[in-house]
Amino acid sequence: GYHFPRRGLGGIKRSAPRAQEYGSFYRGYVSFTAAKPSKSRFDHNPSVFLLINSEDEDGDEVLLSGGLYMPSSRQLKAIRERIAANPAPFEALFRSKPFARSFPDGFSTERIATRPPRGFDREHPYLHWLKLQGFFVWRSYRRKEYTAVDFFDRVACDARQILRLNELLENAIAGR
């Protein structure tokens, strides 16, 4: 199952040189990452990431994301091959009402290649997914949302949708 690796818990205390640089011993944010243990030190498993940043100037002080942000080349190729061969499970996930309500934009286009990946059809109907270099979704919560009584239920619902995506990614990587 999922666990919080030691590196996955963002510390709030800064080192002495950083404290001098930023003027405070404490960071204005804290982050948590949960993932299944990886069998390889080069591959990372899909994860769930939560960031709470009190100093965010855009008002997106709480961020929830999940999926595979920086897949290894082996993982990237496996996911692309799965999408090229059978995009139906991903399409069904993104079309499902709970997932679409949580992540209406689908995969993030933050990390996308300019050209189609080598070995894939330039006319593939899901080329926009094949060009992705990271397979993750994210959403931010405004102050009105994260101060609401039902905020924890909302985050739990969104995290369950991320786990559905992570299962698809894990299956693609494992060749199942």
List each model region and its residues:
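Gly/Pro-rich turn-and-neighbor structural signature
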Residues: G1-S24
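A generic structural signal for short, non-catalytic loop/turn and secondary-structure boundary residues
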Residues: Y2-P5, F25-R27, D43, G59, ...
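A residue-level signal for beta-strand positions that form part of recognition/binding surfaces
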Residues: L9, Y29, G134
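Pocket-edge structural micro-motifs
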Residues: R14, A34-K36, R139
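Aromatic- and glycine-enriched beta-alpha-beta binding-site module
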Residues: R18-A85
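A contiguous pocket-lining binding segment that forms or flanks enzyme active sites
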Residues: G66-R118
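Long, solvent-exposed, polar/charged low-complexity segments
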Residues: P104-R176
